């Protein structure tokens, strides 16, 4: 004698729903490619690539020379200006240290 209990597992129900969705979908052969372009495209169109290369040949190169002016925001320089010590100041610091030791 066997007794069957109803299954109340939500995972089982999700699995059954997914199986039903998979069984009811159209085969890939029936899905045709539309001639219109969608708002997104996985692979680039080869004609777009050729057009891009032609435009690229016409673009001018821009050369930017560095300036000695103020540092722009976000740009890091090493060592920072507040840590740069003049040689004259270093010499006076060494003399002060020697005098303090004596």
Curated annotation (Swiss-Prot):
Q: Tell me which UniProt keywords the record has, alphabetically.
A: Cytoplasm, Nucleus, Transcription, Transcription regulation
> What do the Gene Ontology cellular component annotations say?
cytoplasm; nucleus
Q: Where in the cell is it found?
A: Nucleus; Cytoplasm
Region called Disordered, residue ranges = 66-102
Q: Which residues form the LBH domain?
A: 18-101
Is Transcription regulation found in the keyword set?
A: yes
- Output compositional bias ranges, type Basic and acidic residues: 90-102
The source's domain of life comes to: Eukaryota
- GO BP annotation list: regulation of DNA-templated transcription
Q: Which family does it belong to?
A: Belongs to the LBH family.
Described purpose of this protein according to its UniProt entry: Transcriptional activator.
What's the name of the protein?
A: Protein LBH
Organism, by scientific name, is Xenopus tropicalis (Western clawed frog)
Upper classification of the source organism reads: Eukaryota, Metazoa, Chordata, Craniata, Vertebrata
Q: Coding gene? A: lbh
């Amino acid at each position: 004698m066997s007794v069957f209990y109803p299954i109340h597992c939500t995972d089982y129900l999700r699995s059954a729903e997914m199986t039903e969705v998979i069984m009811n979908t159209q085969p890939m052969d029936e899905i045709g490619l539309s001639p219109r372009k969608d708002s997104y495209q996985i692979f680039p169109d080869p004609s777009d690539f050729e057009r891009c290369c032609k435009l690229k040949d016409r673009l001018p190169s821009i050369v930017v020379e560095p300036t000695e002016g103020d540092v722009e925001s976000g740009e890091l320089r090493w060592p920072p200006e507040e840590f740069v010590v003049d040689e004259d100041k270093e010499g006076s610091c060494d003399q002060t240290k020697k005098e303090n030791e004596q």
